[in-house]
Amino acid sequence: METPPLPPACTKQGHQKPLDSKDENPEKHCPLTVNPWHMKKAFKVMNELRSQNLLCDVTIVAEDMEIPAHRVVLAACSPYFHAMFTGEMSESRAKRVRIKEVDGWTLRMLVDYVYTAEIQVTEENVQVLLPAAGLLQLQDVKKTCCEFLESQLHPVNCLGIRAFADMHACTDLLNKANTYAEQHFADVVLSEEFLNLGIEQVCSLISSDKLTISSEEKVFEAVIAWVNHDKDVRQEFMARLMEHVRLPLLPREYLVQRVEEEALVKNSSACKDYLIEAMKYHLLPTEQRMLMKSVRTRLRTPMNLPKLMVVVGGQAPKAIRSVECYDFKEERWHQVAELPSRRCRAGMVYMAGLVFAVGGFNGSLRVRTVDSYDPVKDQWTSVANMRDRRSTLGAAVLNGLLYAVGGFDGSTGLSSVEAYNIKSNEWFHVAPMNTRRSSVGVGVVGGLLYAVGGYDGASRQCLSTVECYNATANEWTYIAEMSTRRSGAGVGVLNNLLYAVGGHDGPLVRKSVEVYDPTTNAWRQVADMNMCRRNAGVCAVNGLLYVVGGDDGSCNLASVEYYNPTTDKWTVVSSCMSTGRSYAGVTVIDKPL
């Protein structure tokens, strides 16, 4: 007996017409079924057919690479192939199609992507993959390449990435690379890419209002470095470059001691005119300065990058490897990659997008080793050793060089000073200080390097003396003394003023703070910290001076406090480090993208 047929789907019993949506409840309609795996399964089968060379109707050829494929698949995924196979071009009927603009391996990767939606972008292939994806109009691949390059932005490569993005019409990447270069200007100008820029590109960069710089001297020194890189050819551009350096914004001392003495300025009448303009600006009363409006008197208005404070190693109570960061925006601490080995009493700087931990004590020996930390990769790497072993040294960056100042080598305090050139990965000695100084604090203001206080092992005294180093003359000169002896003082620079924070004189641990103004060659007292600290880290960020950890003479401190010069008050940060640390290295970095 035959089974009677079922009534047609979605019809009333005994009726053959579909339901009228106007008459019936929509909820009774049959749902539309969508199988999310259907397309994926179909492409998987098509890729299997391709790998077996089944049903393929075209062979794509690049160099000596032959790639069987299906026209309909290529045309469906690539507008380039769609135009080729659906138009009147000879390739629409050809069994073999040669692509001359792309190498074989890259084309194979892109055809694989068409079938699988999978691709791996690396440092090695991105420069050929992106233009090839652009040619085949595979916009998703091009976007992936741009996102990869954006994640790789670094002071040493951002100018090259910017040029690459410009060449291949990657507008978003171009803008981001340009912004990155502006925000990291002080480190970018130390790169080979900057030194190899053309004059138009240099002028475009240094004329930007968005440069993130601590002082206009960064721009002046960048110009001098660029010209000296190929002096015979480039010195004719000095006047054109100096037009974009905002000399009136520089301190008078820097104008007289550095700019006026620069041979490249002396040899250009136009440059001397810019210098005279700047000097006149400084001679005017404040009210009249406001009326002297020009591009060179306009303050730059950079976009503020989010900052992190990095605290490296330290004594807790023995030398440790731990590294932690404080996020100012999120107001919290987090751990990052540890040091390769234990280290305390080290010098610490941020230069060329890297954090450098210089010398120090590993728990048994004073060391001359140096490690650099890449915040983007969260990775430490060893660089060239110093010439001398140093702990309790001072470290600072001046004119693109890292200086290691004084310290203790295990037997005696040091007056020697050495500098590190990141480009050659080499250390070399410069003029020694006039006094041996261990537990010395250092800072850079107005193109001069200051060594503050410390301990003189020869006289067995904590020091109140201060001396400054002029790199052009390669000499150290005493300046005004502090009001008190300070060894292990934290030293920081804020608003072109030099701060000496805490420290000790023998058993007495201080909470007092004094500040030095280079324009008056005088120290003055400001508000005391909330607690006594010596061997603490100091850094300036967002107009505030932060003091981190240290010890109070009896225990290591995990607390942090900051000084506001506007209110002359210290405030304790609510969030503490995970452990108390003294002799830790502290610096501020740009938060990685």
From Swiss-Prot:
Segments forming domain BTB: 56-123
Disulfide connectivity for this sequence is none
- Organism domain of life: Eukaryota
Q: Name one GO biological process term.
A: protein ubiquitination
Q: In which pathway does it act?
A: Protein modification; protein ubiquitination
Basic and acidic residues composition-biased segments = 17-29
Q: Which InterPro entries match?
A: BACK, BTB-kelch_protein, BTB/POZ_dom, Kelch-typ_b-propeller, Kelch_1, KLHL2_BTB/POZ, SKP1/BTB/POZ_sf
Looking at the record, which segments are called Disordered?
Answer: 1-29
Cytoplasm found in the keyword field: yes
Q: Which Gene3D superfamilies match?
A: 1.25.40.420, Kelch-type beta propeller, Potassium Channel Kv1.1, Chain A
Q: What is its main location?
A: cytoplasm
A GO cellular component annotation here is:
cytoplasm
Q: Which CDD domains match?
A: BACK_KLHL2_Mayven, BTB_POZ_KLHL2_Mayven
Kelch repeats (start-end): 308-353, 354-400, 402-447, 449-496, 497-543, 545-591
Would the keyword Cytoplasm be found if you checked this record's keyword annotation? yes
Where does the protein end up? Cytoplasm, Cytoskeleton; Cell projection, Ruffle; Cell projection; Cell projection, Lamellipodium
Q: Which PANTHER family match?
A: KELCH PROTEIN, KELCH-LIKE PROTEIN 2
- How does this protein assemble? Component of the BCR(KLHL2) E3 ubiquitin ligase complex, at least composed of CUL3 and KLHL2 and RBX1. Binds actin. Interacts with KLHL12. Interacts (via N-terminus) with FYN (via SH3 domain).
What role does this protein play? Substrate-specific adapter of a BCR (BTB-CUL3-RBX1) E3 ubiquitin ligase complex that mediates the ubiquitination of target proteins, such as NPTXR, WNK1, WNK3 and WNK4, leading most often to their proteasomal degradation. The BCR(KLHL2) complex catalyzes ubiquitination and degradation of NPTXR. Responsible for degradative ubiquitination of the WNK kinases WNK1, WNK3 and WNK4. Plays a role in the reorganization of the actin cytoskeleton. Promotes growth of cell projections in oligodendrocyte precursors.
Q: What is this protein called?
A: Kelch-like protein 2
Species name: Mus musculus (Mouse)
